[in-house]
Regions:
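Glycine-rich phosphate-binding loop of ATP-grasp-fold ATP-dependent ligases
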Residues: 2, 6-11
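PLP-dependent aminotransferase class I/II
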Residues: 14-226
Length: 226
C-alpha cells in the first residue's frame, strides 16, 4: 500500500512438503498450499495463518524502487492520503450510523494505510459485513476487518512456531511455563469485527475516486437507518 515494492527470493529444495512450509514462512505464515489466491482467501475466511511467518518477498530491484519512493513519502504519499482522509472526515462527521472515525492526537498521527469507520449498529439495520457487501455491489473497494483477533489463528492455537521446537511457544528457555491460547478472548476486539468498515485512500487515486466512495457510503448509510 505504501510503496510498489513487491515479491521475490528463492529457496531450492527436493522436499515438496518443506517447499510448502517455506512458501508459508515467507508470506506471514499463510496456508498457501490449500489456497494460492490469498486475496480471495482473506475475504472468504477470517483465520488463515497456519504457522508463524514473516514477510520475505522483496527483490533487490524492488527494494531500490521502495527506497526511492520513500524519498518523496512526506512530500507526495502521506499528504495525498491525509487530504483524502479529510474528505472522508468531513463527509462522515455527524452521520447517525457512524460511531467513530480515525483519530489523530499529539502523541499519534495516522498514516492512513486504511480508513477504518466504526459503525453505530444501534442506528443501522445492517452490520459491517452487510455494509461491505452493499459497497461491493456498487463496485466500490471495501473490506471489513481482514485480520481479526490473532489468538484465533491456527498458528497460535496449535502453537505452530519455528522448526520442530515450535519456538518460541514451546521453548523452555524462552517460556518455561508454556502458552495456551485456547481460553483467550478479547471482547472489545471481537466486537469491532461486526461494526468496522475499511475504506481505501491510495495516493494514486484522484479526488473523484474518493468522492465515489463517499457517495456510495452515504447512500448505503441513509438507506439503512433505523
Amino acid at each position: 500500500h505504501f510503496t510498489t515494492a513487491g515479491e521475490g527470493g528463492m529457496v531450492l529444495t527436493m522436499d515438496e512438503d518443506l517447499g510448502w512450509e517455506c512458501r508459508a514462512f515467507r508470506d506471514h505464515g499463510y496456508g498457501v498450499k490449500a489456497r494460492m489466491n490469498m486475496l480471495a482467501l482473506e475475504e472468504a475466511l477470517p483465520y488463515i495463518h497456519t504457522r508463524v511467518g514473516f514477510n520475505y518477498r522483496m527483490t533487490e530491484v524492488q527494494s531500490i524502487c521502495g527506497i526511492n519512493e520513500l524519498a518523496r513519502f512526506d512530500s507526495w504519499n502521506i499528504p495525498r492520503r491525509k487530504a483524502y482522509a479529510k474528505m472522508y472526515d468531513e463527509a462522515f462527521a455527524g452521520l447517525k450510523g457512524v460511531k467513530a472515525l480515525p483519530v489523530n492526537t499529539a502523541e499519534r498521527e495516522n498514516a492512513y494505510w486504511w480508513y477504518p469507520v466504526t459503525l453505530n449498529l444501534n442506528a443501522l439495520k445492517i452490520d459491517a459485513p452487510a455494509f461491505v457487501n452493499e459497497m461491493k455491489k456498487r463496485k466500490i473497494p471495501c473490506y471489513g476487518i481482514q485480520w481479526p483477533e490473532a489468538y484465533e489463528e491456527r498458528s497460535y492455537k496449535e502453537l505452530n512456531g519455528f522448526g520442530t521446537a515450535k519456538f518460541p511457544f514451546c521453548s523452555k528457555e524462552y517460556n518455561p511455563k508454556g502458552i495456551n491460547y485456547e481460553g483467550v478472548i478479547c471482547p472489545v476486539a471481537k466486537s469491532l469485527r461486526a461494526c468496522t468498515v475499511n475504506l481505501f485512500l491510495h495516493p494514486t487515486w484522484e479526488k473523484e475516486h474518493i468522492q465515489r466512495v463517499i457517495d456510495a457510503f452515504v447512500e448505503i448509510h441513509n438507506e439503512n437507518l433505523k
